[in-house]
Amino acid sequence: MKPTERRILLGRIVGAFGVKGELKLESWTEPRSAIFRYQPWIVRTPSGQESVLSGVRGRDQGKNLIAVFPDITDRDTVEAMHGTEIYVARSALPPPKPDEYYWVDLEGLQVETVEGVKLGTVSHLFSTGSNDVVVVRGDRERMIPFVLPEYVKSVDFEANLIVVDWDPDF
């Protein structure tokens, strides 16, 4: 990975599993087990120490996602990794399908209405279960359902712009 390449946070280590060095993970990929498809991992401990891992294997285990890191075979080492964040280079992710977007690619884009009223910048997104919501910060914070084409009319990465059909007073 190039030092300037953008990293994507995919999950974190939340604990140990068993006594053989297996780890419990929290994954933000969809489905959660997809985290194992994207490698190598850049792992960053809570103290800021980073390392690169390849060949990580894993599985679903009931409510948990279990990982096996190469060369880690004891529980004590795993316990010390609690809270470690798991990143990959943005280039490790496949291109999104048409009309699908990675949230991280939308963050920082400008948002304006179909009438040209500037609303602000995408701060972040979250899921409600039924749809995603884009949080736009400008003169105030707005939460706009990320629903194509009803509210989101276009996403233009070249222009750094999302156009929405949204009342600026709402």
UniProtKB/Swiss-Prot annotation:
It is found in: Cytoplasm. It comes from the Bacteria. The keyword Nucleus does not apply. It holds the Pfam family RimM. GO terms for molecular function: ribosome binding. Residues 98-170 form the PRC barrel domain. An accessory protein needed during the final step in the assembly of 30S ribosomal subunit, possibly for assembly of the head region. Essential for efficient processing of 16S rRNA. May be needed both before and after RbfA during the maturation of 16S rRNA. It has affinity for free ribosomal 30S subunits but not for 70S ribosomes. Binds ribosomal protein uS19. PANTHER family: RIBOSOME MATURATION FACTOR RIMM. This is Ribosome maturation factor RimM. It comes from Xanthomonas campestris pv. campestris (strain 8004).
